[in-house]
Amino acid sequence: NVFFYELGYDMSLDAEGNYDSDRGTDTLAKYAKQFGLGEKSGLEIPESEPQISDEYSILSAIGQGTNNYTVSQLNRYVATVANRGTVYDLTLLKKTTDSDGKIIKEYEPDVAGTMDGVSSNTWDLVHQGMIDMVASTPSFSGLEVTMAGKTGTAQQSDLHPDHALFVGFAPAEDPEIAIAV
């Protein structure tokens, strides 16, 4: 969290070095939208509207603040990380058929956006950090595939318990699946 606290602080500094939380949350929102976190994921079932944090840039940088996403929205985000910048609309459908098994419609992935301007080196560093997190966590020892991931804890209030979160993808070298639980 210290790294992301510092990142949230640095994003909030103007050219003279003055701290402005709104500047930081605006920058975070810009990138969150590029990852597709500013809209529903595309699933064919009812889904909550996402909320990109609009206050407390330092807390928002570690995923707290007023961020609010469904698991499917986070899955879409981590799939974008896995494939290095293409945001897809999610779907539960591969095809529809009639009662005889004849294909009525096949569903292809729809691209909702791309993250331009992110270097291969940056994606490599993000992937390696996520691989290292999984490799250094005893809960993941013994996996037969190299996995990349990130844990998190959503804190709602003193009256509600914390929510554990894991997002990841595998195989890390050539991702085939992204998960959020």
Which ranges hold each PLM region?
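Beta-lactam-recognizing serine transpeptidase/beta-lactamase-like catalytic domain environment
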Residues: 1-180
